[in-house]
Amino acid sequence: MDALLIQGGNPLAGEVRISGAKNAALPILTASLLTAEPLRLGNVPHLKDISTMLALLGHMGVRVTLDDKNHVTLSGDSIPHKEAPYEMVKTMRAAILVLGPTLARFGEARVSLPGGCAIGSRPVDLHIKGLQAMGADISIEHGYIHARCKRLQGARIVMDMVTVTGTENLMMAAALAEGTTVLENAAREPEVVDLARCLIAMGAKIEGAGTDVITVHGVEALHGAEYSVMADRIETGTFLVAAAMTGGRVRATHTSPDTLEAVISKLREAGAKVSVGDDWIEVESTGKLDSVDVRTAPHPAFPTDMQAQFMAMNTIAVGAASVTETIFENRFMHVQELRRLGANIEVSGHTALVRGVARLDGATVMATDLRASACLVLAGLVAAGETTIERIYHLDRGYERIEEKLTQLGGRIKRVH
């Protein structure tokens, strides 16, 4: 099993090109199920979750052509298997996203209940309730969601809680429904907006994406399109925190500053110098940072997927700060690993109190989920001596060639098999 070896102490410097966003690419890939015509996508990152999704779509009958490095063409003119089997769903919760488009276009779908990171329960009942409100007949048997309908009907759907994948699933389903669907308490995340833009390019009629009320006027059919996936705001944020922690100067390019306002604000509060252009963000730091309180909440507030990275930053900052997680349960699994490096962290319920220490010491640690593994990489970059991170397959689910990109910036990091 692969591991990362990191020699800490080098400031990072230079430019890093940000990859396409995994959490935007996954729903956009499933949008290929909504049309018989080819969908050509650019800026698709090379990640485990992406290849898993492409394998699932291929299993269902979508013809997948990898045109070049980051382009993929999906042709869904024939979908003989309207099913997402457990073997393909268990490693990736985003597979639930095939439910809405498959049901809307074909009137039937069978999807295994999802797996993925072990953080929180992430209930799929909001997806199911929404589709039922649109007229679907849904049952759960033997671990599978069975859904049937004639043609989905537009409906007013009020989400009990903000759900990104739920909003995306229902938005795709509503695109082919008869009549108008209104999604209230919809997720406002940039990835939801990116999916809406792709669907609009395919002929969908959608208003309000990026607000908490999305209106979808159903159409008879969608057509093919060319679309480029948005930049990964979480990868961007991770490199910016790495620059701040190591006392370096890093410019992240091919990214979208307007999707990261909460993160940029917190970096400035910590004492880092942040400059912003149209498609780049630069962080310059002495490495001497102030602790910052962080509270996760749905967009546009501070993103849960940056919580672990800011906890790592707080471990070596001056003072004490609280990190509060309001989105997912079980999202402090990195705390015990950071403690192995010498961090001073106490957890009480959904809040961790982090007291900065003078230095971290390298040790062997274990990645427990995607963002936890990123925070351990950041800690390893500043820890004295060598840090070994095991189980980095989690990292490969969400970061494209992270060790190569960090090496180009001056980090001493290598993958061992």
Curated annotation (Swiss-Prot):
Can you tell me which residues bind phosphoenolpyruvate? 22-23
Sites bearing 2-(S-cysteinyl)pyruvic acid O-phosphothioketal, chain numbering: 117
Q: Does the UniProt entry include the keyword Transmembrane?
A: no
Q: Name one GO molecular function term.
A: UDP-N-acetylglucosamine 1-carboxyvinyltransferase activity
Listed under catalytic activity are: phosphoenolpyruvate + UDP-N-acetyl-alpha-D-glucosamine = UDP-N-acetyl-3-O-(1-carboxyvinyl)-alpha-D-glucosamine + phosphate
Catalytic residues, per the record, are: 117 (proton donor)
Indicate the principal place this protein occupies in or around the cell.
cytoplasm
Q: Which Pfam families match?
A: EPSP_synthase
Q: Which GO terms describe its biological process?
A: cell division; cell wall organization; peptidoglycan biosynthetic process; regulation of cell shape; UDP-N-acetylgalactosamine biosynthetic process
The pathway is: Cell wall biogenesis; peptidoglycan biosynthesis
Q: Record's GO cellular component, any one?
A: cytoplasm
**Which sites bind UDP-N-acetyl-alpha-D-glucosamine?**
93, 122-126, 305, 327
Q: Which UniProt keywords apply?
A: Cell cycle, Cell division, Cell shape, Cell wall biogenesis/degradation, Cytoplasm, Peptidoglycan synthesis, Pyruvate, Transferase
**Annotated EC:** 2.5.1.7
- Superkingdom of the source? Bacteria
Task: List the subcellular locations.
Answer: Cytoplasm
Report the HAMAP family cross-referenced here: MurA
Protein family per UniProt: Belongs to the EPSP synthase family. MurA subfamily.
Please give the NCBIfam families that the UniProt record associates with this protein: murA, PRK09369.1
Q: What does this protein do?
A: Cell wall formation. Adds enolpyruvyl to UDP-N-acetylglucosamine.
Q: What is this protein called?
A: UDP-N-acetylglucosamine 1-carboxyvinyltransferase
Per the UniProt record, the source organism is Thiobacillus denitrificans (strain ATCC 25259 / T1)
Q: Which gene encodes it?
A: murA
